[in-house]
C-alpha cells in the first residue's frame, strides 16, 4: 500500500535502540520478542503524525505497551502509551490510551495474535484492535508532539511478541493527514454517514 513501510526487517534489530539489549531478540518467523525486567525498544526514527500497525501476542498475565511519540530516555519514556494487557493485573486493558482513556475489558485471549492499528494526528489519537475502534481521543493539552515508537516489555512475568510492524508517516498538515483515514479506520466512515430520515407518523 502506498506510503507504508516496514519498521522491522524480520531478521535482526538493525536500527532499533534499547538501553537493555539483553531483553530483546528476534525469534520464530520474524518476531520481535521482549523478555525479562522492564525495558523498551525504540524505533529507528522519530515521527510526528503517522499510522502504525503491528500484530502482538501476550502470555497469560502479561503486560506490555506501544509508546507513541516516545522520548528516547532511560526508565519509562514520556509518550502516549497504547496499553497491551489482556489478563494482567492492570485495570487498563488492551486498547486503552494509558491514563487518558481506559478500556476496562479485553476481548483478546492470552497467547493469541491480535492486530493493533493506531494513529496520532496532531492532538488526536486513535486505537483500533482487530478492526474495532476503541479510542478516538483528542488530547486538548497536546502533551506529546513528536518522538519514537517504543515497544514495552513490562515485567519479569511478561512475554510479548510483535510482528508485521509497519508505519505510514503522514503530513504535518492536519487536514492532509486526516484525508482517507476512514480507509484504515472504517468506523470513522460510519460516523460521517448522514442520519436516516425519520418516517412521519
Name each model feature, range by range.
Residues 1-201:
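Carbohydrate-interacting regions of secretory-pathway proteins
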